[in-house]
Amino acid sequence: MVNAPIKLLIAASGTGGHLFPAIALAEKLPDYEIEWLGVPNRLETQLVPKQYPLNTIAVEGFQQGLGISSLVILGKLIGSILKVRRLLKQGNFQGVVTTGGYIAGPAVIAARSLGLPVIFHESNALPGKVTRFFGPWCSVVALGFDVATKYLPRATSVCVGTPVRSQFLNLGNNSQLDLAIPGDVPVIVVFGGSQGAVAVNQLVRQAAPAWFEAGAYVVHLTGDRDPDVDSLKHPQYIELPFYDNMAALLQRANLAISRSGAGSLTELTVCGTPAILIPYPFAAEDHQSYNAEVFTKAGAALTFKQSDLTAELLQTQVLNLLQSPTELAKMGENAKAIAVPDSADKLATLVREVVER
């Protein structure tokens, strides 16, 4: 008699930082029957492969104070917990994995109320409030950065790194980079993660003319909410909302200018791409600054607060690095040194150990 496959529910929603690691994990568990838990009209409706049935619940974060809106949100939360509990029970699921965010609460509470194991993956150097609160409830918290351990004293935690998309696991082939860039010029890649970064985009457009004069090409991934798209025209300037083959692009890049979300940083390390980091100043608890600090201490990046950064300063810093190939190479080596390219395998092994024991 053939054993039925293990059923696993993955709760991941909202941004690429939550979704890409979860998708990478799912790809490493081909023998599992996996379903997805998300939120309607969020990025998961586009990114999650169709092979994983998508279940949705209505959930959002609490605002400051206890007004009518908070009571409405509380009502939605209770309803979501009951819906997830029913899904887990009727579907005979044997475990839950979550990558955090608002959706983690209902998933963790529902699973633990049924006695199911929960694996929580936290990508950031400073674990979020949801992770810190629910971490002790979980079977184990898998960490992207070892430094995060100190913020979770009551949780069982292990550092596995942050899984990257499968395209980053087959490096060494740049033939898929279908952009009109000569092979012998420096390339600067600018990106703000899955949500873009309008303030960074503005600084880059002001600073870029001097980089063009230095012979550099700029590949600028603006996101889809930039009001100034098409405001800069130059033969060495390639502007796109997104680019599918980030692995090939980051491998080709001499330098990246980026926010410091955990997912983006993980991709930089796997590709060995040196970076100038500009943490998103409105991130919850300024957690992107904690991520950037890990890279700065490792010598893999330069970090600037958005409030301190002018177009002139950014222009100068980039030119200095382009004129110092030895320093850029060292930064790239330092980035590689903190990479965990087999993170998805490590997390999959951990999931198997917890769910199958």
UniProtKB/Swiss-Prot annotation:
- Tagged with keyword Signal: no
Membrane topology listed for this record: Peripheral membrane protein
Tell me the enzyme class: transferase
The record, for Pfam families, names: Glyco_tran_28_C (PF04101), Glyco_transf_28 (PF03033)
Q: Which residues form the signal peptide?
A: none
Query: What CDD domains does UniProt report for this protein, alphabetically?
Result: GT28_MurG (cd03785)
Any one GO MF term held by the record is: undecaprenyldiphospho-muramoylpentapeptide beta-N-acetylglucosaminyltransferase activity
Annotated catalysed reactions:
di-trans,octa-cis-undecaprenyl diphospho-N-acetyl-alpha-D-muramoyl-L-alanyl-D-glutamyl-meso-2,6-diaminopimeloyl-D-alanyl-D-alanine + UDP-N-acetyl-alpha-D-glucosamine = di-trans,octa-cis-undecaprenyl diphospho-[N-acetyl-alpha-D-glucosaminyl-(1->4)]-N-acetyl-alpha-D-muramoyl-L-alanyl-D-glutamyl-meso-2,6-diaminopimeloyl-D-alanyl-D-alanine + UDP + H(+)
Q: One biological-process term from Gene Ontology?
A: carbohydrate metabolic process
Q: State the superkingdom.
A: Bacteria
The record's listing under InterPro entries reads: GlcNAc_MurG, Glyco_trans_28_C, GlycoTrans_28_N
Q: Which UniProt keywords apply?
A: Cell cycle, Cell division, Cell inner membrane, Cell membrane, Cell shape, Cell wall biogenesis/degradation, Glycosyltransferase, Membrane, Peptidoglycan synthesis, Transferase
State the pathway, as annotated in the record.
Answer: Cell wall biogenesis; peptidoglycan biosynthesis
Q: Where in the cell is it found?
A: Cell inner membrane
GO CC terms, sorted: plasma membrane
Annotated UDP-N-acetyl-alpha-D-glucosamine binding sites: T15, G16, G17, N124, R165, S194, Q288
Q: What are its E.C. numbers? A: 2.4.1.227
Task: Give the record's family classification.
Answer: Belongs to the glycosyltransferase 28 family. MurG subfamily.
Q: What is known about what this protein does?
A: Cell wall formation. Catalyzes the transfer of a GlcNAc subunit on undecaprenyl-pyrophosphoryl-MurNAc-pentapeptide (lipid intermediate I) to form undecaprenyl-pyrophosphoryl-MurNAc-(pentapeptide)GlcNAc (lipid intermediate II).
Which NCBIfam families does the entry mention?
murG
Q: Write the protein's name.
A: UDP-N-acetylglucosamine--N-acetylmuramyl-(pentapeptide) pyrophosphoryl-undecaprenol N-acetylglucosamine transferase
**What is the species of this protein?**
Nostoc sp. (strain PCC 7120 / SAG 25.82 / UTEX 2576)
